[in-house]
Amino acid sequence: MSKIYNFNPGPAMLPKEVLLEIKKNFLNWNNSGFSITEISHRSSSFIEFTIQVEKDLRNLLHIPENYNILFSHGGARGQFSAIPMNLIKKFKKPDYINSGYWSKCAAKEAKKYCEPNIINVKRYTKNKQKYIESPINWKITSKHTYLHYCPNETIEGIEIFEEPILLNKIIIGDFSSTILSRKINIKKYGMIYACAQKNIGPAGITIIIIRNDLLISCKKKIPSILDYQLLFKSKSMLNTPSIFSWYVSGLVFKWIKNLGGLNVIEKKNIKKAKILYKYLNSTNFYYNCILPSNQSRMNVTFNLYKNELTNFFIQESEKSGLYGLKGHSIIGGLRASIYNAMPIEGVKKLIQFMKNFEKKFG
């Protein structure tokens, strides 16, 4: 059977080394006689494992000691509610940057609990390619202390590489699709969060990295499962967590550490994205609509000039072992999600398929 490559935006591809480790331990984890799916979250062996998981993540992202790491349920959408519910007592009218679909979803959910000031980021076109204004030009209100934004919009393939520098501003970032793909200066943020199913592991666990002073100031009367203080006090085990997702996440952190950390991962991701965008720029059969300054390293969106061939392209790509290339239903087209676990061989195979398809139908 030929090698299969998963270009889905999530659940995404997992590293082969991690899959082999899962296979080895699935029926008998840590020589316990139990499957990892059966192990008690209260067992000393699993608690010891979670301590190492947190330590590895803290080292990978250089998380300062005055930040806490929480493991939660509900994905990023759960955090769209949890953030205003926990923090709005202190920050009554937050700012929400609208740079695309997911940041817009976060703002829409926040409206249920507060009156967010929505800042629509300006969009421009240059040589038929779109880009958005730099964070330094965002019209931020000085009186609103907490600012929420999403640095990578997966649907359109737009990434914001500049980190906002805002004095006296609590910055909260939805890093669901870009966490662990590049270096982040955690000190610039009051809180960041990410669902697992893109660069971390299987869906089922959500990572929250929150500064101590924000954790202390959280509201009290909110649903327990979304309460940051309760999550912290219970060591992220207020109820039975997603053991398997937590376990695989730990294996992924170890895999990144063994590769050499985020410096190595970021270089690999830059290289993968560079060769794919370079090919797209060299052809008159496909095109990408995003200016290089905002081209996502994780989600490469593109179209065929002969749009009527799009569905056939998807069918033929699957026959070649290339899955998940259909664009989001909102904008259509095509999308290759090339998260951390996607090897450069997968990107090269995609490019070769695209060249062959162009020869046949161009």
Swiss-Prot record:
Keyword Cytoplasm in annotation: yes
Localization in the cell: Cytoplasm
PTM annotation (N6-(pyridoxal phosphate)lysine): residues: 198
GO molecular function per UniProt: O-phospho-L-serine:2-oxoglutarate aminotransferase activity; pyridoxal phosphate binding
UniProt protein name: Phosphoserine aminotransferase
Family label: Belongs to the class-V pyridoxal-phosphate-dependent aminotransferase family. SerC subfamily.
Organism: Buchnera aphidicola subsp. Cinara cedri (strain Cc)
EC number(s) per entry: 2.6.1.52
Reactions mediated catalytically: O-phospho-L-serine + 2-oxoglutarate = 3-phosphooxypyruvate + L-glutamate; 4-(phosphooxy)-L-threonine + 2-oxoglutarate = (R)-3-hydroxy-2-oxo-4-phosphooxybutanoate + L-glutamate
Comment on bound cofactor: Binds 1 pyridoxal phosphate per subunit.
